[in-house]
């Protein structure tokens, strides 16, 4: 009623386990020993256990079972051959070879063993194996014979001797040609610096310089060297032709990759990511490490942890946009489903019979994966935008701090940095137009007027010395009454007689250098421009009023001496009332002659 357990089942199970990485020949030989010592019954039990493993779904288990059957066939004699050639076992082999779900490697191995066993089993009682082979062959289930590759021929002694001779010559040439052919010109140059008179002859031609020791070589070696030179020249030219082609087609660098595994950084500067995240590639630093960014963090990551994502084509982008529009257009179906569910009562209404409800539910259910995909996409965009905003805030804070430090160092007491940090759309949108308008502003001299002013200043140098304006006074340093001018030419020129000077030229001479400084440092924003124009207008009005009255006094009482200078204290008081720049450029005490 109950059948006894097969004694070979456990050992065959171990020998064909799916946990093995290769054939366990120790167990295979142990099975063969048990079959040889057990007789016909042992052979029958062993082949039955192997037959169970042949129908396993794991391809590795099937391969291990076929290997074990082949070992039993080769080591256990006629009793094992009869069991292998039985109808039950041969039908199992044929089923493996003809099954479409069987792995191709298992099919090839099984058909090869059937062919091998059909040729080895020459006993009349084993004819079923030959019939199985013929049947499989008629159904094209047996792999065709592959012509074995010819084994490499053993080199003869003459070939070995010739190779040794060529190697010896190559070594001699390499010793003589140290640094390669391209190193000989530099070698000759170094010898030219040290040897003196022998250098010109050595450097007269590169061909003669390349063969300094060719005369000492044997004729065969000279011929070998010439062939080596020709081959090197051809190789250089071919590589030169091939170089533009390789440079024209640089390897493409991926722009996006997807993480295949979780990566936890072990060193500072590495990028951490989780499986499935899309990483934006910033640079391919090394062959196996790239630099990327994800969730606002940047760092390097191993290439074998990710897979390259191709850039989306215009068609794909269009399809995604259409799918997104379709999802938003179908959002009304979800609202209809919710409103309909609120109006139904499961206690009194049969929901299964409501076709409209079922249709709305199926439509909403089909939208679910698309909505999740859109959520993931927009979540990534939100993360990137937040990271971009954080970077901008950091950059803006750094810029504000550096601008404050720069203004406090190079422009103390000037305007605040807020004047520079205020956004100016007119400069961003109409930069070229505002620049042209600023250049043509009537309150600033044009290039032509400025050159005319320079020419007038140079031509009226003799008239300008009538008014003894000391440049040091312009910078706030008064000259003492008894001090002599340091420049002799200035003393000589100041004593030359001259006629009275017009007030316009006096004003121009007095303002020449300050105006140049003001023009060279013209402001570039509206507020500073208005302040500049106001200060300039007030300064011109004051100077015209003062110097006209002073010139009138000097013309009425002219006696050939210097005209009287204006009182510096009065000028400082008047300039302080106007509050131009917060300080005066005149001396704090009167000067004398």
UniProtKB/Swiss-Prot annotation:
Keywords: Endosome, Membrane, Protein transport, SH3 domain, Transport. GO terms for cellular component: endosome membrane; ESCRT-0 complex. The keyword Transmembrane helix does not apply. CDD domains: GAT_Hse1 (cd21386), SH3_GRB2_like_C (cd11805), VHS_HSE1 (cd16978). Residues 162-181 form the UIM domain. One of its GO terms (biological process) is protein transport to vacuole involved in ubiquitin-dependent protein catabolic process via the multivesicular body sorting pathway. SUPFAM superfamilies: ENTH/VHS domain, GAT-like domain, SH3-domain. It is found in: Endosome membrane. Residues 136-251, 474-593 are annotated as: Disordered. Residues 194-227, 540-552 have a biased composition (Low complexity). GO terms for molecular function: phosphatidylinositol binding; ubiquitin binding. Residues 15-144 form the VHS domain. Residues 175-193, 232-241, 504-521, 566-593 have a biased composition (Polar residues). Belongs to the STAM family. Component of the ESCRT-0 complex which is the sorting receptor for ubiquitinated cargo proteins at the multivesicular body (MVB). Component of the ESCRT-0 complex composed of HSE1 and VPS27. This is Class E vacuolar protein-sorting machinery protein HSE1. The gene is HSE1.
């Amino acid at each position: 009623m109950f059948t006894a357990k097969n004694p070979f089942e456990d050992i065959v199970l171990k020998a064909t386990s799916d946990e093995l990485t290769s054939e366990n020949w120790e167990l295979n030989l142990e099975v063969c020993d048990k079959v040889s010592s057990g007789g016909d019954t042992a052979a029958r039990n062993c082949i039955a256990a192997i037959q169970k493993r042949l129908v396993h779904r794991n391809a590795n288990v099937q391969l291990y079972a076929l290997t074990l059957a082949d070992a039993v066939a080769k080591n256990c004699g006629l009793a094992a051959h009869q069991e292998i050639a039985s109808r039950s076992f041969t039908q199992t082999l044929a089923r493996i070879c003809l099954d479409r779900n069987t792995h191709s490697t298992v099919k090839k191995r099984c058909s090869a063993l059937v062919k091998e066993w059909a040729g080895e089993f020459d006993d009349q009682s084993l004819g079923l194996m030959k019939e199985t082979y013929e049947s499989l062959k008629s159904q094209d289930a047996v792999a065709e014979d592959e012509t074995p590759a010819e084994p490499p021929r053993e080199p003869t002694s003459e070939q070995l001797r010739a190779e040794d001779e060529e190697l010896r010559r190559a070594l001699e040439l390499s010793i003589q040609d140290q640094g390669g052919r391209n190193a000989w010109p530099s070698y000759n140059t170094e010898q030219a610096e040290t040897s003196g008179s022998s250098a010109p002859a050595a450097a007269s031609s590169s061909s003669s310089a390349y063969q300094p020791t060719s005369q000492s070589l044997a004729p065969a070696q000279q011929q070998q060297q010439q062939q080596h030179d020709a081959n090197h020249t051809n190789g250089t030219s071919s590589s030169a032709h091939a170089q533009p082609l390789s440079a024209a087609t640089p390897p493409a660098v991926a722009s996006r990759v997807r993480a295949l595994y979780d990566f936890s950084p072990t060193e500072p500067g590495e990028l951490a990511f989780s499986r499935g995240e899309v990483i934006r590639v910033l640079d391919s630093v090394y062959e196996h490490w790239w630099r990327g960014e994800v969730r606002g963090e940047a760092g390097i990551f191993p290439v074998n942890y990710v897979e390259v994502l191709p850039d989306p084509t215009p068609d794909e982008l269009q399809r995604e946009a259409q799918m997104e529009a379709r999802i938003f257009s179908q959002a009304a179906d979800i609202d209809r489903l919710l409103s309909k569910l609120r109006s139904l009562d499961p206690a009194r209404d049969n929901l299964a019979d409501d076709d409209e409800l079922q249709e709305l539910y199926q439509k909403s259910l089909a939208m679910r994966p698309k909505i999740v995909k859109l959520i993931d996409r927009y979540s990534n965009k939100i993360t990137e935008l937040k990271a971009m905003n954080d970077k901008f805030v950091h950059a803006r804070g750094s810029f504000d701090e550096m601008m404050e430090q720069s203004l406090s160092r190079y422009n103390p007491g000037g305007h605040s940095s807020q004047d520079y940090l205020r956004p100016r759309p007119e400069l961003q949108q109409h930069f070229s137009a505002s620049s042209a308008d600023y250049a043509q502003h009537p309150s600033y001299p044009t290039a032509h007027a400025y050159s005319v002013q320079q020419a007038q200043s140079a031509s009226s140098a003799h008239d300008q010395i009538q008014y003894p304006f000391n440049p040091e006074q312009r910078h706030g340093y008064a000259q003492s009454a008894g001090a002599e001018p340091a420049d002799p030419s200035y003393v000589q020129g100041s004593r030359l007689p001259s006629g009275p000077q017009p007030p316009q030229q006096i004003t121009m001479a007095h303002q020449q250098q300050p105006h140049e400084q003001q023009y060279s440092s013209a402001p570039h924003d509206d507020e500073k421009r208005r302040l500049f124009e106001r200060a300039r207008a007030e300064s011109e009005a004051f100077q015209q009023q003062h110097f006209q009255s002073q010139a009138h006094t000097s013309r009425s009482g002219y006696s050939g001496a210097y005209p009287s200078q204006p009182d510096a204290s009065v000028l400082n008081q008047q300039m302080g009332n106007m509050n131009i720049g917060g300080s005066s450029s005149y001396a704090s005490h009167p000067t004398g002659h």
